[in-house]
């Protein structure tokens, strides 16, 4: 089924609930889950407003005018999510999907120099042939690394990934003192210094504390992403 009822769409989608018909585009299976992604058609029509209708949005996508993470996507239902880089080919505009305190996820304009850079959170590691380690990231991407590099990078760490050259540019460990941003939950979009980690048996449910000035927020480890040692390594805020 390629559509779903508007009333059942994630609450943060920027669509009218009682206007525009009963149905809305449903994201196709892809790198991000349904609850935390937007189909390209809605990005084009309702967020960027390059189209007035779904038909116009489908045409724009089908012409190959939209790149996601450096790859032309022609599926109007393709799901875009956290930290994805969206490029409008004819205009050269580049956007990053970032956590936002008002809109949950929002498109942030970024310089073209950052079009090939993406933050990826490590969700797990496995050993493959030859003793090398394969890293698994939040967007479904996998990367095989040398044993030495793989040993340094832990689950919940973040890497700055070069989409064009498919290489790791920076490794940001999940540790006290780093700058992190909340990616899910009621505190989504808040960023600050990680000053506390209360480890629990289920590591993903460990309680963490972030501080920015006098403001303090608490959430769980599974809901944050490290974005820099002293400051974010790429643009994630206006």
Curated annotation (Swiss-Prot):
Spell out the SMART domains in the cross-references. S4
Q: Which GO terms describe its molecular function?
A: rRNA binding; structural constituent of ribosome
Name the Gene3D superfamilies for this protein. 2.30.30.30, 2.40.50.740, RNA-binding S4 domain
Question: Which InterPro entries does the entry link to?
Answer: Rib_uL2_dom2, Ribosomal_eS4, Ribosomal_eS4_central_region, Ribosomal_eS4_central_sf, Ribosomal_eS4_N, S4_RNA-bd, S4_RNA-bd_sf
**Disulfide bonds, which pairs?**
none
Tell me which UniProt keywords the record has, alphabetically.
Ribonucleoprotein, Ribosomal protein, RNA-binding, rRNA-binding
Q: Which residues form the S4 RNA-binding domain?
A: 38-100
Q: Name one GO cellular component term.
A: cytosolic small ribosomal subunit
GO biological process: any one?
A: translation
One Pfam family name is RS4NT
Top-rank lineage group of the source organism: Archaea
Query: What is the protein's given name?
Result: Small ribosomal subunit protein eS4
């Amino acid at each position: 089924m390629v559509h779903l009822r508007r009333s059942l769409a994630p609450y943060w989608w920027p669509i009218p609930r009682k206007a525009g018909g009963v149905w809305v585009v449903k994201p196709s299976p892809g790198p991000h889950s349904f609850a935390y992604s937007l189909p390209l058609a809605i990005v084009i029509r309702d967020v960027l407003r390059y189209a007035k209708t779904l038909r116009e949005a489908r045409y724009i996508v089908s012409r190959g005018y939209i790149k996601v993470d450096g790859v032309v996507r022609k599926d109007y239902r393709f799901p875009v999510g956290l930290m994805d880089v969206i490029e409008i080919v004819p205009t050269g505009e580049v956007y990053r999907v970032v956590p936002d305190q008002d809109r949950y996820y929002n498109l942030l304009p970024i310089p073209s120099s950052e079009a090939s850079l993406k933050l990826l959170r490590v969700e797990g590691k496995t050993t493959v042939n030859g003793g090398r380690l394969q890293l698994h990231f939040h967007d479904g991407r996998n990367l095989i690394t040398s044993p030495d590099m793989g040993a340094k990078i832990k689950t919940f760490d973040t890497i700055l990934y070069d989409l064009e050259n498919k290489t790791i540019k920076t490794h940001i460990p999940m540790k006290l003192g780093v700058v992190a941003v909340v990616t899910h939950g009621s505190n989504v979009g808040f960023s600050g210094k990680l000053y506390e980690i209360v480890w629990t048996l289920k590591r993903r449910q460990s309680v963490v504390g972030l501080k920015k000035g006098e403001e303090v927020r608490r959430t769980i480890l599974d809901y944050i992403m490290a974005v820099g040692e002293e400051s974010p390594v790429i643009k994630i805020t206006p």
